């Protein structure tokens, strides 16, 4: 009883609101436009988010704490040449992969000379500034001897060239660790790619060579010069490529990922304009009909204007509050399109059910009472789900900002639909009541006055006048609309046909089977190349890097951050055990081998162990570079102690798999907790992948929970709680199918796809809730009759919004960007699967599942029978229209 009272009370409130808006249409039409112009004007000076890490790396993660600890001991900016990572290397740098089209050996004489010429050209790059020209020597990272740090492969190639010049045949390159002429052992696993080896790891050939040039960025001037040097670096590599057409070069810099991420917005512009034109055309066609008076083409256009005003207002507010633009915002207009269009088409559908002899104010009040309650509840669902996503519980900034922007846009869209679109409906209502042309707004003459006009003129002015319409035909004046006619006369009878139902059920079982198959293969996508435009430096470099340099993982720093008994043999065994199985670049292991070669026991007393380490081992030229890996401290009694040290580990992998690397990280972390030696592991890529899975799923998980809670509490606002049960089951079915099919379509579970899944919850409720409500609340008659009625009442609005949404998505498929490709596939699946449920699954399943309907009992008395039929006809359509009843 309470639910019915609340339901009727809300309908009455919306009816009065509609009457009030119809009484002041000019104010409610102009106010949203003025607000949008004032707030949207600030968007002309929008700022672009520059930091990809800020957007896509989890905000709160253990890796960031570990990075701070590592930085306090061994600054990462100076160590980045040791901590190799493909796309996440910190600071400024330029990198190039050199390979051959014919898969030639890059270590032969010709290619060796070519690469050394490229190296010389890169080091001579000049960045002009007022009064000074900066070269690589001015902005490079310096070694202890004040020389620029360059990749060890450059020294290897120089030694190889000298060996050939002097006809020395004893020079050999080993892989993945080789020795230079000064005795240093260096790791070359990420500098030589596509390697073929002889016995004892001697390199026979290499298909690719990678060079990296690390730059300083210690202040703003230095950073600006380094950024310009990176741009000149790419230009130099391209010019070198043109003059040496037999080799292929893949340049990459620290700015490439950011620029290619932002490039998505630029390459999407003309496709979005095409999408807008198609949506406008389809919306106008969906609102048009042959009757030139009752046709509403302007409402189709004004519905899109309403959505545009809300989006512009939200963008202005985000900009005024200090928000910055990023390419993920491309999905916001499509979120608005799915929600806003259905609301406007539902209002138009309700308008068609009102009586034409009523005043416009009364018709508008009836429209608001009929459609605004469901639209308000679905809007509340959007606000709650996206609001949870915009909360601090969301650990990925890109997802949080997207949800925040969507929340603001949806809120203003709701207000503008109530005001701007409602007043537009009032204006078109007056045009209709005055029998004016729906496009040209001129009085339409009666058919008698058009007899002498040309056929095309009579066609343009086709209209039905009330005095020419029989009383019983008044409710059918809108049935000349193509979609209304299609649903009422053909589709409703076909989908509820007894012979069609088994095929639909079979098709649904196939749908569930394929969805389950895809669901079991869901993979998490933390690859940053999935968010950038295609045919860019990032994509080309990543493809080459995975092809030639995926044999080994990124270099993992192994940091012992407290003083331990390095001289103790049991501690030595523990440290060696922890690093066993990795390719190691370790001062500790080298020092122990050094002692063994001198026939000195590794279990020396502490003082002897430390003195020999400082005064003998680190003084040797081949081991002097290890000085950066050890931190000594003097105690009060002048005793020297090793307070912290680091080693570098590389894991052998068949392929650089993010999940495999994350599992390795978690394994090492668990080991650090239980081990006697206190250590941490770090690589810059860990900042992006640490807790990525939980951070990624949190917005979707929280949104699902909030949606369930809202459905539970909204059961008190709807007339029957069974509506919410059906909505929940439908949402589960749709989301399950979308996740499964997007996996089969090679879409990983990343930031973009998770945001689309959150939107999918709301899109499903948006389209299915009104239809389910009409079915569940129906009294008497059969389930089949009420399924047909629900489709007739709400099917047109669903079909209209679906057609507009799909034509708007189609141009998105052609955008040359991985981000928009993911966006298109997810949104298309959401729209298609929801449409499949609305027009196939639900109409069939509802015919044999609860709630049951009481069959009408026919009365023997003809007078009673006529009265009962009149009442039932009113209940079926739940409108103010009563068809002519003939009972004889």
Curated annotation (Swiss-Prot):
Underlying gene: PTCHD1
Q: What is this protein called?
A: Patched domain-containing protein 1
The record places domain SSD at: 268-427
Presence of the UniProt keyword Transmembrane in the record: yes
- The record lists its disulfide bonds as none
Report the source organism: Homo sapiens
Per the similarity annotation, which family is this? Belongs to the patched family.
Chief localisation class: membrane
Q: In which tissues is it expressed?
A: Widely expressed, including in various regions of the brain with highest expression in the gray and white cerebellum, followed by the cerebellar vermis and the pituitary gland.
């Amino acid at each position: 009883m309470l639910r019915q009272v609340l339901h009727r009370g809300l309908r009455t409130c919306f009816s009065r609101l509609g009457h009030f808006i119809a009484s002041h249409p000019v104010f409610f039409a102009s106010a949203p436009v003025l607000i949008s112009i004032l707030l949207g004007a600030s968007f002309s000076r929008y700022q672009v988010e520059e930091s990809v890490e800020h957007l896509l790396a989890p905000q709160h993660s253990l890796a960031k704490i570990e990075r701070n600890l590592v930085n306090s001991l061994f600054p990462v900016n100076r160590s980045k040449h040791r901590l190799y990572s493909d796309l996440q290397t910190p600071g400024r740098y330029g990198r190039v992969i050199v390979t051959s089209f014919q898969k030639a050996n890059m270590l032969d004489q010709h290619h060796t000379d070519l690469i050394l010429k490229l190296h010389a050209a890169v080091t001579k790059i000049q960045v002009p500034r007022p009064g000074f020209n900066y070269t690589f020597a001015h902005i490079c990272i310096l070694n202890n001897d004040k020389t620029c740090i360059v990749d060890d492969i450059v020294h290897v190639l120089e030694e190889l060239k000298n060996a050939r010049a002097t006809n020395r045949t004893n020079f050999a390159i080993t892989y993945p660790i080789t020795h230079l002429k000064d005795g240093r052992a260096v790791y070359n696993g990420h500098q030589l790619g596509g390697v073929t080896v002889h016995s004892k790891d001697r390199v026979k050939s290499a298909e690719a060579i990678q060079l990296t040039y690390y730059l300083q960025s210690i202040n703003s001037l230095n950073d600006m010069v380094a950024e310009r040097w990176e741009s000149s670096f790419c230009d130099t590599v391209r010019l070198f490529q043109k003059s040496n057409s037999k080799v292929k070069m893949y340049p990459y810099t620290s700015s490439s990922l950011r620029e290619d991420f932002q490039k998505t917005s630029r390459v999407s512009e003309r496709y979005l304009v095409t999408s807008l034109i198609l949506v406008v055309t389809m919306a106008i066609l969906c609102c048009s009909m042959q009757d030139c008076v009752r046709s509403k083409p302007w409402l189709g256009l004004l519905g899109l204007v309403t959505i545009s005003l809300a989006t512009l207002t939200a963008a202005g507010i985000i900009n005024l509050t200090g928000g910055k633009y990023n390419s993920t915002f491309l999905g916001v207009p499509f979120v608005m399109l799915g929600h806003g269009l259905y609301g406007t088409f539902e209002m138009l559908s309700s308008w068609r059910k009102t009586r034409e002899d009523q005043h416009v104010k009364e018709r508008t009040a009836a429209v608001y009472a009929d459609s605004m309650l469901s639209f308000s509840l679905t809007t509340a669902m959007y606000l709650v789900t996206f609001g949870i996503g915009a909360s601090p519980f969301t650990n990925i900034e890109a997802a949080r900002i997207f949800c925040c922007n969507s929340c603001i846009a949806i809120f203003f869209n709701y207000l503008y639909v109530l005001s701007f679109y409602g007043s537009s409906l009032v204006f078109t209502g007056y045009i209709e009541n005055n029998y004016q042309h729906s496009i040209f707004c001129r009085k339409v003459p009666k058919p008698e006055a058009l007899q002498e006009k040309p056929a095309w003129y009579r066609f343009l002015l086709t209209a039905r006048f009330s005095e020419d319409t029989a009383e019983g035909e008044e409710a059918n004046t809108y049935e000349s609309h193509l979609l209304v006619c299609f649903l009422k006369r053909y589709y409703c009878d076909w989908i509820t046909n007894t012979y069609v139902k088994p095929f639909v059920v079979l098709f649904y079982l196939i749908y569930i089977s394929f969805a389950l198959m895809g669901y079991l293969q869901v993979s998490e996508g933390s690859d940053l190349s999935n968010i950038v435009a295609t045919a860019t430096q990032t994509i080309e470099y990543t493809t080459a890097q995975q092809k030639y340099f995926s044999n080994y993982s990124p270099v993992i720093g192994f940091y012992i951050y407290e003083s331990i008994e390095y001289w103790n043999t049991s501690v030595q065994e523990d440290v060696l055990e922890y690093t066993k199985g990795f390719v190691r670049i370790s001062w500790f292991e080298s020092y122990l081998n050094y002692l063994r070669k001198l026939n000195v026991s590794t279990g020396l007393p502490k003082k002897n162990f430390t003195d020999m380490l400082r005064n003998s081992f680190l003084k040797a030229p081949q081991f002097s570079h290890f000085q950066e890996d050890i931190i000594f401290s003097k105690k009060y009694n002048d005793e020297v102690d090793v307070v912290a040290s680091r080693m570098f580990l590389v894991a052998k992998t068949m392929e650089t798999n993010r999940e495999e690397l994350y599992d390795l990280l978690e394994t090492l972390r668990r080991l650090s907790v239980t081990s006697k030696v206190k250590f941490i592991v770090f690589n810059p890529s860990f900042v992006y992948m640490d807790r990525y899975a939980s951070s990624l799923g949190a917005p979707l998980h929280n949104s699902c929970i909030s949606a369930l809670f809202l459905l539970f509490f909204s059961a008190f606002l709807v007339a029957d709680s069974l509506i919410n049960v059906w909505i929940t089951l439908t949402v589960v079915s749709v989301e399950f199918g979308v996740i499964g099919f997007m996996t089969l379509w090679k879409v990983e579970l990343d930031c973009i796809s998770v945001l689309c899944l959150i939107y999918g919850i709301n899109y499903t409720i948006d389209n299915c809730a009104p239809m389910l409500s009409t079915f569940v609340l129906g009294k008497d008659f059969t389930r089949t009759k009420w399924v047909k009625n629900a489709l007739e009442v709400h099917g047109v609005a669903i079909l209209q919004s679906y057609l507009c949404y799909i034509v708007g998505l189609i141009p998105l498929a052609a955008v040359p960007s991985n981000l928009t490709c993911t966006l298109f596939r997810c949104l298309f699946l959401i729209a298609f699967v929801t449409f499949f449920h609305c027009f196939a699954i639900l109409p069939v399943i509802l015919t044999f599942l609860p709630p049951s309907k009481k069959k009408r009992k026919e009365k023997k008395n003809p007078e009673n029978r006529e009265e009962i039929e009149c009442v039932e006809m009113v209940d079926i359509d739940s409108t103010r229209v009563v068809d002519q009843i003939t009972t004889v």
